[in-house]
Amino acid sequence: MHHIRRGAGKPLLLVHGLGGSWRSWNPILDALAATREVIAVDLPGHGRTPPLDGEVSIDALADALTKFLAGQNLTGVDAVGSSMGARLVLELARRGGTLGAVVSLDPGGFWRGWERHFFYGSLYASIRLVRRLQPVMPFIAGNAAARTLLLPQLSARPWKLSPQLVLDEMRSFAASPSFDELLHQLAYGATQPGVPPGAITRPLVIGWGRRDRVCLPRQAKRALALFPDARLHWFEHCGHFPHWDVPHETTRLILDTTAQS
């Protein structure tokens, strides 16, 4: 599994979301690496990591990530996940024995009824648009008004995002060979199972953007019901990616939570 390491100190794993890569974490990477050794992965079928053989699912990705951590002597590492990656770190926390402290940022898998269709349909349309727009993506990424028109579902303040961050992310979305299959699995596959109270003994925080238009804020209550040992942190004025919209607050939450482990 391709990954980058930056900084020195206690290891900290970063797991990106659907279509992303390790570069998704660039807004907070250096701040975290100032005090931690950051390991940011490209999940299978993303970035420079080839796709999995066979079915592509949350369970399969969780198995692959567990194997990677064991191979890197990182079992028990503190971890942060975003979106699909947030669901992955919750799943590994549920299984037990793989991760230390966990911060799960706007996790998927807690939708019901029409929310599944909204999630699938909106991202299905978005990825097709992003693929069509690749020839002009450098212009879109570099123009604040164009970024705002393209990314309102992902960010509460697209005009403030780094053009390079947006270009990297949109290139990664378009290039991921596993995007379509994972999108369908996330929307219509198995829902995220939970754990009984007291099952998770390491620090666990679920963070949610108040303006998330991918994983709707109403789903946070369901996530807490399934992971009753978790603490919920709300990010105000924030969309689906807290590390994009409120990087300083996100960095502080991560460092404070993982310092307890």
Per-range role (PLM):
Residues 4-50:
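Conserved HGGG/HGGXW glycine-rich cap/lid loop of the alpha/beta-hydrolase fold
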Residues 238-251:
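Catalytic histidine-centered segment of alpha/beta-hydrolase-like enzymes
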Residues 60-77:
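Conserved acidic catalytic loop of the alpha/beta-hydrolase fold
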Residues 138-198:
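Conserved alpha/beta-hydrolase catalytic His-Asp/Glu region
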Residues 200, 206-208:
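Short beta-strand/loop motif that positions the catalytic acidic residue
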Residues 102-134:
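Flexible "cap/lid" loop of the alpha/beta hydrolase fold
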Residues 210-215:
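Acidic catalytic loop of the alpha/beta-hydrolase fold
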Residues 81, 85, 89:
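Gly/Ala-rich beta-loop-alpha elbow adjacent to hydrolase catalytic centers
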